């Protein structure tokens, strides 16, 4: 994981996240009235903001569609939100084209088999410790923290550290 992952993360200009199991713990809360609730970790959100503040675009690709995800993306300033993505690889290609990037300049963090088509195409693949072995073994970086419990933040900081930008990123909070 170490050196190769850092080398791959160094060139990332776009980081894309799955939602369920990555930005959340993967559990869905459904009410009788049909409302869907998800819990997001504020530290993950801060990590996403740090990426954006340091010139790294952030996107979300998720197979499900949810107003909750739309709201959270808006709160974090994520404009590259694609929900209801049955074919994540084609959505990934569309995002790359829209940002005028090639696959080696994009990272992706996923947690399940549906994420494999993107994980094997991107320049920097990240996952969570609870992901199936088929996903973990194809990831360049597997977070120590669980999905929805700081895994995304850990990956954001890893990218910034790989780009020698982490100290600069947190510097504004030390003033």
Regions found by a protein language model. Give the residues of each.
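Fold-independent oxyanion-binding glycine-rich loops
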Residues: 19-20, 25-26, 64, 111-112, ...
């Amino acid at each position: 994981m170490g050196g190769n992952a850092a080398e791959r993360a160094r060139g990332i200009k776009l980081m894309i996240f799955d939602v369920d199991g990555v930005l959340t713990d993967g559990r869905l809360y459904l009410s009788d009235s049909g409302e869907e609730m998800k819990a997001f970790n504020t530290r993950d959100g801060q990590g996403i903001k740090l990426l954006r503040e340091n010139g790294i675009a952030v996107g979300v690709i998720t197979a499900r569609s949810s107003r909750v995800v739309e709201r959270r993306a808006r709160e974090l300033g994520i404009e590259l939100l694609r929900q209801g993505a049955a074919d994540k690889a084609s959505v990934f290609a569309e995002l790359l084209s829209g940002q005028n990037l090639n696959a080696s300049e994009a990272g992706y963090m996923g947690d399940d088999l549906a994420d494999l088509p993107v994980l094997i195409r991107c320049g920097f693949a990240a996952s969570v410790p609870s992901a199936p072995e088929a996903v973990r073994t194809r990831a360049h970086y597997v977070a120590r923290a669980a999905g929805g419990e700081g895994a995304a933040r850990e990956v954001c900081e890893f990218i910034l550290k790989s780009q020698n930008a982490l100290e600069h990123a947190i510097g504004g909070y030390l003033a």
